Amino acid sequence: LQETVVLDDDTETMVSLVGKRQVPILVKDDGQAMLESMDMVRHIESIGAPVLTGPERPEIAAWENATAPKAAPLTQPRYPLLGLPEFGTVAALDHYTIRKRKTLGDLVELRARTRELLRELTPRLEELDRLIECPQAVSGALSVDDVRVLPVLRSAAVVKGLRFPDKVRRYYETMMDRLGYQPLPAV
């Protein structure tokens, strides 16, 4: 697989591939574009020997669905500060800031409310701490559950002052190391 970064203001590329402004997009070898993340995961799993063989637990999907809205006001205002490639031009960075201001509010004000917003996210992380079965895989063996949880944690880890509960921290560190990912900076 080859990764290509689409600048945040490059709506034309997104629309030409999938008919709307959305990422990530997976373009398969036959040229067909896929838009839904879990469809992409299942497609990639079908290419070789399956890796995500563990159980899918409904409580993990429920955790993700309940946690993502709590994390967004903390994480998304920080993305412009991280030097991410999708904000590689002033126009792309401005585009993101304007878009997020419309949906979340003022990004500087949201960053100033970090302590308050962390109080809302912390119970979700404590719940995950109770759900994690082992540091190597949230449900005991690698599964789609890990694909649901790890991106939320990787995003949340950009929040300076956030402390993961013990099992969450061990899981996050183990998975990042296992995948060879460097954590994003905390700001």
What do the PLM-derived regions correspond to, one by one?
Residues 52-54, 137-141, 184-186:
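Short, hydrophobic secondary-structure boundary micro-motifs
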Residues 18-21, 132, 179:
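A structural signal for short coil/turn segments at secondary-structure junctions
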